[in-house]
C-alpha cells in the first residue's frame, strides 16, 4: 500500500469495501494511494538463510537494517549466495517433501532443500554444485499434469496454514531441557505442548531463555512476542556469544530469533506467533527435532483483543475476542511428533509463556491454554520472592506425558523413575502440610519422623530442584 509499499492483509470484506490490517506504521498514507494485491495470504519465505539470523514478526531481517526496519521490506535479503550441492540427477522422480539438494553454510548446520508441498514430478534439469541465491531457480520438474515448475532453494508458505505431514505419530521420548525440576518431575515429550504461566518477576523470560540455550532440540525458534525491548536486547546481545554445550559450536548455528517487541505494530505482533510456528514446521519437515519458545502468548492474546476491538466485534470474557480459544488451539495443535512427507520421524515442541494479570491463573488466556497443553509449569511468586529458581511450584504443576515417558525410562535404565517421582512429590506435599503445623508449634515440637520428612524435603528443594541459570556449573544439568 502507498508509495512505500507497506505490507497488509485483508481481514474483512463487506461488499465493495475491504478492511486491511497493516503490519507497519501507516504514517504518510492518504486517500488515493495505490494498493496492489499479492494474490496470496500472508506468507514467508522458507530457505537456507533462516538459521543463525534475527528477524522481526514478519520474517524481515533485523541485521543490517539500522535502528528500525525500513518500511516495505517484506522478506529476507535474497542477494546472499549459498553453497548448493544437488542430491538428485536428471530423470529422478521427486515428490513433495523430498530433498533435492543440501546447503552447508560455514556458520550453520547443513540444511536440505525440499520440494514444496503440492509439487511432484520428474527432474528435467538441475544446476551443478556451486553458489546460488536462495530464490534462483536451481531445479526444473516436469509435473504430472504436463506442465513444468521451477524450484529454488527457498519457497513461500502461508503462515496460518499448517504444513502437511505424512502422519502424526505418538510421542516416544522426552525433550531434555537441562532443568532438573522439569526433566525429573514434569517432563515434556518431544512434539509436546507446555505452558509456563507466572506473574511479574517470577522468572518466565529467564527460564524461556535458559530452555532455548540448553535444551537438546536440533533447532530452536525463539519468538519474543510483545516483550520489552530491553529484554529482547539482552537476548540479541547474549545468544551470539554462547556455545552449544553438546557440540561446542556457537549456539546461534541452531537458533532462529524472531524479535517483535511491544513498541512494534500490534498487527505484526499477532502475526509473529504464526510466523514462528511456520519456521518451526519447516525445520521439522527436514527431519529435525524443533523447540519453539513463545514469550509471551498473553501479549499475543492482547494483540488479538486490540484488533478485535478496532473491528467492533463483540467482546468475550476479559474483553478478549470470542474466538480466542480457537486461535490458541490453532497454534498449539501445530506441535506434534510426525512422520514427514520425506518419510522421517521429526517433532515440533511448543513452550509458551503466559503472563496472567496479578498472577491470576483463572483469567481467560491461562484457562484456555490449559485445555491445549500437556505440561503446565506454574511459576510461583512466593518461591520467586524467596530467590528459589526456577520458581516452578511442584504442587501446582503437572505433566500428562508421565505414563509414556515411564516406558522410555524403563527402556533406558531407570524402571523406578515413576515411583521415585511419586515419592519426591509425596515428600514435598507432606512438607507443605507439616510447615503449617511447624509455624504454630515449632519444628522442635514435631515428632522425629516428621522432622526427618522436613529435612528430606528441604534437601530435595535446595540441592536438587533449585538451579541457577547464571552459574556455569549449575545452569545445565
Locations of regions flagged by a protein language model:
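A structural micro-motif recognizing beta-strand termini
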Residues: 1, 13-14, 21-26, 39-40, ...
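Short beta-alpha junctions and helix-cap segments that line functional grooves
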Residues: 7-9, 22, 37-41, 112, ...
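Metallocofactor- and cofactor-centric catalytic cores in central/energy metabolism, strongly enriched
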Residues: 16-18, 40, 119-123, 183, ...
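P-loop NTPase nucleotide-binding/switch module
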Residues: 64-105, 109-116, 123, 133-193, ...
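P-loop NTPase catalytic core
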Residues: 184-185, 191-477
Amino acid at each position: 500500500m502507498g508509495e512505500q509499499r507497506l505490507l497488509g492483509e485483508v481481514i474483512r470484506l463487506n461488499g465493495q469495501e475491504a478492511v486491511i490490517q497493516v503490519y507497519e506504521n501507516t504514517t504518510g498514507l492518504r486517500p488515493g494511494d495505490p494498493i496492489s494485491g499479492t494474490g496470496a495470504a500472508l506468507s514467508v519465505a522458507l530457505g537456507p538463510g533462516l538459521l543463525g539470523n534475527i528477524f522481526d514478526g514478519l520474517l524481515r531481517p533485523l541485521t543490517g537494517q539500522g535502528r528500525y526496519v525500513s518500511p516495505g521490506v517484506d522478506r529476507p535479503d535474497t542477494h546472499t549466495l549459498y553453497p548448493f550441492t544437488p542430491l538428485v540427477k536428471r530423470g529422478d522422480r521427486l515428490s513433495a517433501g523430498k530433498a533435492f539438494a543440501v546447503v552447508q553454510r560455514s556458520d550453520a548446520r547443513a540444511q536440505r532443500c525440499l520440494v514444496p508441498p503440492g509439487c511432484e514430478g520428474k527432474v528435467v534439469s538441475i544446476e551443478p554444485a556451486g553458489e546460488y541465491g536462495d530464490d534462483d531457480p536451481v531445479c526444473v520438474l516436469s509435473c504430472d499434469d504436463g506442465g513444468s515448475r521451477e524450484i529454488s532453494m527457498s519457497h513461500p508458505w502461508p503462515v496460518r496454514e499448517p504444513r502437511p505431514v505424512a502422519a502424526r505419530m505418538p510421542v516416544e521420548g522426552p525433550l531434555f531441557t537441562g532443568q532438573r525440576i522439569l526433566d525429573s518431575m514434569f517432563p515434556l515429550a518431544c512434539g509436546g505442548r507446555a505452558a509456563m504461566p507466572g506473574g511479574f518477576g517470577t522468572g518466565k523470560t529467564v527460564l524461556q531463555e535458559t530452555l532455548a540455550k540448553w535444551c537438546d532440540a536440533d533447532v530452536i525458534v525463539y519468538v519474543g512476542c510483545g516483550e520489552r525491548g530491553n529484554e529482547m536486547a539482552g537476548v540479541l546481545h547474549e545468544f551470539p556469544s554462547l556455545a552449544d554445550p553438546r557440540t561446542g559450536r556457537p549456539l546461534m548455528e541452531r537458533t532462529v530469533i524472531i524479535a517483535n517487541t511491544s513498541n512494534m505494530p500490534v498487527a505484526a505482533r499477532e502475526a509473529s506467533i504464526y510466523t514462528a510456528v511456520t519456521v518451526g514446521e519447516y525445520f521439522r519437515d527436514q527431519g529435525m527435532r524443533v523447540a519453539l519458545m513463545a514469550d509471551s502468548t498473553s501479549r499475543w492474546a492482547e494483540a488479538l483483543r486490540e484488533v478485535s476491538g478496532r473491528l467492533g466485534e463483540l467482546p468475550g470474557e476479559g474483553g478478549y475476542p470470542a474466538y480466542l480459544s480457537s486461535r490458541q488451539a490453532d497454534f498449539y495443535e501445530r506441535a506434534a511428533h510426525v512422520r514427514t512427507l520425506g518419510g522421517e520421524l521429526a517433532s515440533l515442541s511448543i513452550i509458551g509463556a503466559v503472563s496472567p494479570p496479578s498472577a491470576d491463573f483463572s483469567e481467560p488466556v491461562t484457562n484456555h491454554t490449559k485445555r491445549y497443553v500437556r505440561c503446565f509449569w506454574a511459576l510461583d511468586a512466593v518461591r520467586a520472592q524467596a530467590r528459589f529458581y526456577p520458581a516452578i511450584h511442584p504442587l501446582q504443576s503437572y505433566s500428562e506425558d508421565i505414563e509414556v515417558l515411564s516406558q522410555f525410562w524403563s527402556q533406558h535404565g531407570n524402571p523406578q523413575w515413576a515411583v521415585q517421582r511419586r515419592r519426591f512429590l509425596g515428600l514435598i506435599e507432606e512438607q507443605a502440610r507439616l510447615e503449617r503445623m511447624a509455624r504454630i508449634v515449632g519444628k522442635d515440637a514435631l515428632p522425629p519422623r516428621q522432622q526427618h520428612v522436613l529435612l528430606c524435603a528441604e534437601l530435595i528443594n535446595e540441592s536438587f530442584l533449585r538451579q541457577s541459570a547464571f552459574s556455569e556449573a549449575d545452569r545445565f544439568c
